[in-house]
Amino acid sequence: MASETVQLYNCGGPEWSRLRQVLMMLRLRMRPVEADQYGLTLQQLLEQQEARIPVEEEFHDPMLVFCGLSSAKLEQLLTAMRRASLPPIPLKAILTTTNRDWTSQQLWQELRREHEAMMQQRGGKK
């Protein structure tokens, strides 16, 4: 079984120290992903390949990818994140057989589309 890992995008500044503390408290591995790695697939990142494959369009939104977490551990993490009063991180995903071959850029684009669609739905219901 793969080690429980959270891939971190744009979560490196001091405002994210509480997130790192939560991850350490839960004994989860952290894998910061740099912009020049956005062209690697999520699986390649999980395997800790160090190649650099930049993309044309970088993104700056914070994003998390949960890899190898059980449902219980994921729920524990999300609860701890809410209690830690972290800055909002609307872009979150679980590594799946479908998205593991996507690049970070592709995942970001898909999560942005989904997030925007959800926000439009919420706005339409009010």
What are these regions (language model features)?
Residues D36-L42, P62-M63, I94-N99, G123-K125:
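Short C-terminal domain-edge/linker segments immediately following a structured domain
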Residues S3-L8, H60-F66, L77:
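Short, structured motif recognition centered on aromatic/hydrophobic residues
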Residues V6, S17-R18, L28-R31, L74, ...:
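Helix-rich interaction surfaces within compact, conserved domain-sized segments
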Residues Y38-V65:
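Short, intrinsically disordered low-complexity segments
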Residues R20, P32-A35, P54, F59, ...:
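Homeobox/homeodomain signature
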Residues M1-E47, R122:
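N-terminal, charge-rich interaction modules
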